[in-house]
Amino acid sequence: MKITFLGHAVFLIEEKRTFLIDPFIKGNPAFPSNYILPDIDYILVTHGHGDHIGDTVELAEKYGATVISNFEICNYLQMKGVKKVHPMHIGGVKEFEFGKLKMTPALHGSGIIDGNNIIYGGNPGGFLINLKKSIYHAGDTGLTKDMELLEGVDVALLPIGGNFVMDVNDAVKAVEFIKPQIVIPMHYNTWDLISADANEFKDKVEKLGVKCVILKPGESLEV
């Protein structure tokens, strides 16, 4: 299984199926300019903010992908012409043809800006994706004790940029709660407002005995 970081909170996961998480492509200063997306089977959207719902509508149409998100976002996307959606909610677990997926809690917002309107985007979340390995994408979130309830996480994708999400120290505490085999930092240094030192995070995480892999946009990890 290959995990590719595409800047900000965008990840591509390739196994038997290909998953794109939080597809913020256009306008993403961290997206690698020469990167060409492969065919996408599933698009996972953690919440409705523009830097996460991103280019979902266009990409779902281009690839014929199924979008998995919360109920409200799926309804919104259907109104925008997305044909294949699968709505879930926090705590929901579903056995798909690729494996089991759970939507996890996140402490954040989820309003969708549509023109001059802000549309209710349901509850923000994360995803626990069980393939050959278990991948946890936390979404945008503050530190929460719910993370202690996660079990068997092989790879955790955690925001560290502060201001809107956990900072380095809270993300380290999240690692203590989750106890993953590997952690990859995300949602940092896209803009000055979420600047963070990934090497500081790595040093603190590895003192806990957990492997930390810092991926530059466009780089991949095989697990």
From Swiss-Prot:
Gene3D superfamilies (UniProt xref): Ribonuclease Z/Hydroxyacylglutathione hydrolase-like (3.60.15.10)
Question: What's the domain of life for this entry?
Answer: Bacteria
List, alphabetically, the SMART domains matched.
Lactamase_B (SM00849)
| Any one GO MF annotation of this record | hydrolase activity
Q: Which InterPro entries match?
A: Metallo-B-lactamas, RibonucZ/Hydroxyglut_hydro, UPF0173, UPF0173_UPF0282_UlaG_hydrolase
Provide the alphabetized UniProt keywords: Hydrolase
Q: Which cysteines are joined by disulfide bonds?
A: none
Question: Does the keyword section mention Hydrolase?
Answer: yes
Q: Which family does it belong to?
A: Belongs to the UPF0173 family.
List, alphabetically, the NCBIfam families matched. Answer: PRK00685.1
Q: Which PANTHER family match?
A: UPF0173 METAL-DEPENDENT HYDROLASE MJ1163 (PTHR43546:SF3), UPF0173 METAL-DEPENDENT HYDROLASE MJ1163-RELATED (PTHR43546)
Q: What is this protein called?
A: UPF0173 metal-dependent hydrolase Tmel_0315
List the source organism: Thermosipho melanesiensis (strain DSM 12029 / CIP 104789 / BI429)
